[in-house]
Amino acid sequence: MAHTSSSTAPSRATTATYAAFISAGFLTATWAGRIPQLKEALQLDSGTWGLVLLAMAAGSVSALPTAGIIIDKLGAKWAVRIFSSLSGLALVGIGFGYLIGPAPVVISLYLMGFGLGVWDVAINVHGARVERAMKRTIMARFHAGYSVGTVAAALTAAVLIAVGFPIWAHLAIVGLGVAALVFYSVRNFLPEEAPSSSTPKVETDTLLDPADAQVVPKKTFFQVWSEPRTLAVGLFVLVFAFAEGTAIDWIGLGLIEGHDAKAAYGTLGLAAFLATMTLTRWFGNGLLDRYGRVAVLRALAFTALVGVLVFVFAPTPELAFVGAAIWGVGASLGFPVGMSAGGDDPANAAMRVSVIASIGYVAFLGGPPLIGMLAEHSSVLQAMLVVAAVTPIGFFLASFLRAPKRDVTSLIEGGADGQSDAK
């Protein structure tokens, strides 16, 4: 009986992790799907709205640098429970706050951003732990679960907008529902790994081949912040997070204001981006196993560039819709593979994932407000060209995500990823 419980624990933990990722995506896209209506209801111009979005960025950025410490203290399970509840209640606050004015929305966005910041790091740390327990790469599929949540939320928002469902009721129902669902589902998370500062761990942070890594003890929070490879991976994630975050917050407005599309069509454009991102994340493991992290991520950086350019310069809303779909493919794997790279060494996974996420979220949440400020002096579509300008940086940084080749750190089923990247 004990054997059965032990063997099924990783499977149950996998399901619980999917639930946490899906819920995070559903909550985030519920907010994003209502952005055009909230902006209109508050009667704000693009520049001022960009400043409102900055509140969410500030919340996440202030949470992420210490998220690893919080998770070490509380454990992933309780970190997810507490901060998903905070995020859900903050969404309720947005739903009622916009009826009063911008100030309650700004406060609620800050709290939602803070909650999402810790929640995101915690589920990625636990996802890396599940990968080690399952002995195969599944992080991209966890992030596909996040995208499933975003697609479902975007489609739900499109339907509710079309039928005139109240914003406050929509956000309140989702906020409370997500908080309750996550609190219950994470009961099946894996037990916390006992820390051991005296046992040497395999160090994979190196600018050379990961096979040349040395055996060193577990690192401190500040030591991890000084690692060249970790910082390079963080910068890589920043580039892809900027592409993803800009799309989520501005594709709808880009279609409506830039391509003169109807409100529901703008939300469907966001759904197209999220749908292709989801499919690529779900099936991307096969590409990573066959061709390796570096080759796949470089190809996706180029794809994202093409998608942005098609979206911006499309002569019709229909072609812009296609550009949004291509953009979703290109932006799909950068963030999840970056999280996997941070968890390559289990000894320092929590701290490294926290650092990488901290760097990435500067763009993921701070980039969209920047687009708003630029749009105030030009247009939404012209401002989006900044994404096209920075995406090539990800192409050159992809080499830092090369997977370790040794068994002690490899999570790739059959070792294909390490073999491919070694070429």
Predicted stretch roles:
Residues 63-76, 161, 280-293, 375-376:
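Helix-to-loop junctions at the C-terminal end of transmembrane segments
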Residues 291-338:
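C-terminal transmembrane helical hairpin of 12-TM major facilitator-type secondary transporters
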Residues 77-81, 297:
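Primarily marks hydrophobic transmembrane alpha-helices of the MFS/SLC 12-helix fold
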